[in-house]
Amino acid sequence: EKPTRFPARAEWVTDTTLATTLGNEDASLSTIEHLVAALRGMGIDNCTVEVSGPELPIMDGSAGSFVYLIQQAGVRAQARMRRRIVIRRPIEVRDGNRWVRVLPSRDFKVSVEIDYPHPVIGRQELESWVISPERFAREIAPARTFGFARDIGLLQRQGLALGGRFDNFVLFGEEGPVN
């Protein structure tokens, strides 16, 4: 059987309910966030990922396991220059009260703000960081994913989050962390 192929590009996103899913009419792949973060964080922009199921494994609940595997495999420069996207003016996209803004910069910098309707998470902000592969591996990749107890049933009925354990994500109940 010939494998189904699709690129990890925004136009291939088919669902973002509690996880990001890529796909086409033949197949889909869910929970791609940690792998995509590890690839970007480690400076990889061209690779092939082969999987045997509909969801990437959650492993330790972070991008750290993927970073470790990338470091063990090694990264090789390619003979061809990569295409770069150059941001020349601010770009902003809004969807209700959610937004993303991209600004011109020589470096890959990230500023993040979350305003989540949960008493423990609430509003948090991370000031602008320059992200190098070393900094990503050390300070960002180990951050574990979180989820809500109220969502576990829905995810598992969809065949997702089957690898979820108390040691690979932070679980929140209505009042705060459960684990």
Q: Where are each of the predicted segments found?
A:
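C-terminal regulatory domains involved in ligand/effector binding and gene-expression control
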Residues: 1-45, 50-179
